[in-house]
Structure formats: structure tokens, C-alpha cells
């Protein structure tokens, strides 16, 4: 397993990993992790995929795992679209290193939402996508949730964790 860093769209460095198979690779799988996670949690799964001939790569989103800057845990500098652009930056680097191989994304939980945004923003960039642990909410619930998020951001500032939102999301 190789650890490396690439620049984040919003500033800072993304902590990345790449697992290489011992056999000739069949394809690349890029993992997009969920909220309150880090790529280290996927080590066993990445090694399993390696045993079946897949290159696996992933980045800790800004504010997660090895990409936390100071006390900005969970914070995407510049917002959601910067996190999506960071996923693309790792894709572009990895695809250039392994030209001609099929490229598969696997997004889990919050990573599934990042991947869904990625799919409609950069549809040409992949051969397949696996969306795991995703969800769908009625428009009214989404609007109410967004309004609450904006209220908490104004109340606390964009870099602070909201105990209320944390409780609503994680219980």
C-alpha cells in the first residue's frame, strides 16, 4: 500500500492511498468514503479487491482522517463542490497512471452522495459506479434540513460543529 498526497481544491493536502495487486490489474476501483470515516477503514476491503486483480485508490476527504487541518474535523473548505473536485483530482491522477484500465467508483454513505454529484458533473470519467448506503428524502425534508444547516452555520460559523445537527444525524 502506497501513501501519497495531492493538493485539495479548497487548499491543504489530501491524504491518499493506493493498493496494488500482485497480478496484472483488471481495473481501478476508487473508493469514496462516508461521513465521519477515513480510508483506513477500507484497508481490508482494498486488500480483498487486490487479491482479485483490482487496483484500489482512495482519498481522505478534507476534514477526515489524514486530511484534517488543525481542528477543522469534517470541514470541506469551499464547500461540497470542492470535495467533488477532489474526487476528480484523484481520478485524473490515477487514470493517467493506469491508462486503458476500466475505472470503477464505489461511494458509500456520504460518499454515495459525493459520487452521485460527480456522476452528473463528470459523466465521461468512469466506466461503472457502485452506490452503497445511499438515501433519498422528500423535497420538503431536504429543504427543512438545508434551512436548519444554514441557520446553524450562521449561528456558529462555517467551521464549527453543530451539536444539534450532530445529534440529529448520528443520534
Predicted regions and their residues:
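Conserved alpha/beta-hydrolase
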Residues: 41, 46-70
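N-terminal cap/lid segment of alpha/beta-hydrolase-fold proteins
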Residues: 1-23
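Alpha/beta-hydrolase active-site loop
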Residues: 77-95
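Glycine-rich nucleophile elbow surrounding the catalytic serine of serine-hydrolase chemistry
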Residues: 107-117
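Short beta-strand element of the alpha/beta-hydrolase
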Residues: 26-34
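Active-site glycine-rich loops that stabilize anionic/oxyanionic intermediates
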Residues: 34-37, 109
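Alpha/beta-hydrolase fold nucleophile elbow
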Residues: 98-109
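Alpha/beta-hydrolase-fold enzymes
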Residues: 115-171
Amino acid at each position: 500500500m502506497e501513501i501519497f498526497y495531492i493538493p485539495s481544491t479548497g487548499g491543504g493536502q489530501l491524504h491518499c492511498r493506493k493498493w496494488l495487486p500482485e497480478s496484472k490489474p483488471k481495473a481501478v476501483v476508487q473508493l469514496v468514503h462516508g461521513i465521519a470515516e477515513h480510508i483506513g477503514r477500507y484497508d481490508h476491503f482494498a486488500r480483498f479487491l487486490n487479491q482479485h486483480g483490482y487496483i484500489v485508490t482512495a482519498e481522505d476527504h478534507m476534514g477526515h482522517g489524514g486530511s484534517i487541518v488543525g481542528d477543522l474535523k469534517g470541514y470541506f473548505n469551499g464547500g461540497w463542490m470542492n470535495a467533488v473536485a477532489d474526487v476528480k483530482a484523484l481520478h485524473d491522477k490515477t487514470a493517467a497512471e493506469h491508462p486503458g484500465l476500466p475505472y470503477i467508483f464505489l461511494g458509500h454513505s456520504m460518499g454515495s452522495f459525493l459520487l452521485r454529484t460527480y456522476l452528473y458533473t463528470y459523466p465521461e470519467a468512469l466506466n461503472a459506479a457502485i452506490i452503497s448506503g445511499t438515501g433519498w428524502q422528500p423535497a420538503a425534508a431536504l429543504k427543512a434540513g438545508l434551512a436548519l444547516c444554514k441557520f446553524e452555520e450562521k449561528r456558529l460559523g462555517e467551521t464549527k460543529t453543530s451539536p444539534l445537527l450532530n445529534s440529529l444525524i448520528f443520534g
